[in-house]
């Protein structure tokens, strides 16, 4: 528990359509120790998906390092979660002191499971409020299917 939170960041629920419990941790080491606790989050809490994140080392090519767990819906860990990155825009607007304009925050996710993904997150701040977000990244097709109705 002593590893939870850093700077102004505290655990919170944020959503860009899908609610995520956003859990800041103090270091990459604490992030590496994170593991899903099946049943720990109930729908009454408002989120069953958990996005655990830490600020990256100053020498890293990314701003934040993250992991996403959703065992309640059958996802042990996800290597890249665009919907969580979109919700993370709200975290940045709330807990970072951002000047007006566009800001870029690359997020490394999936490294602990051997599937590192770099998600590009850009946020726009106007008059101190979040007014826009853009998510970018590359994907690898892992399956394909056809649904006939």
Each predicted region: which residue ranges?
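Active-site proximal loop and beta-alpha junction motif in alpha/beta enzyme cores
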Residues: 1-149
């Amino acid at each position: 528990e002593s590893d939870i939170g850093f700077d102004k960041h505290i655990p919170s629920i944020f959503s860009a359509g899908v609610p995520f419990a956003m859990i800041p941790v103090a270091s990459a080491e604490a992030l590496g120790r994170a593991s899903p606790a099946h049943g720990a989050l109930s729908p009454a809490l408002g989120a069953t998906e958990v996005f655990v994140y830490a600020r990256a080392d100053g020498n890293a090519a990314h701003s934040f390092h993250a992991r996403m767990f959703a065992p309640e819906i059958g996802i042990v860990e996800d290597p890249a979660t665009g919907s969580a990155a979109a919700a993370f825009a709200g975290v940045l607007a709330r807990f970072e002191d951002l000047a007006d304009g566009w800001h870029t925050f690359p997020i490394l996710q999936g490294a602990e499971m051997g599937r590192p993904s770099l998600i590009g997150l850009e946020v726009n701040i106007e008059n101190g409020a979040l007014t826009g977000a853009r998510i970018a990244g590359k994907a690898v097709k892992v399956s394909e299917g056809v649904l006939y109705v």
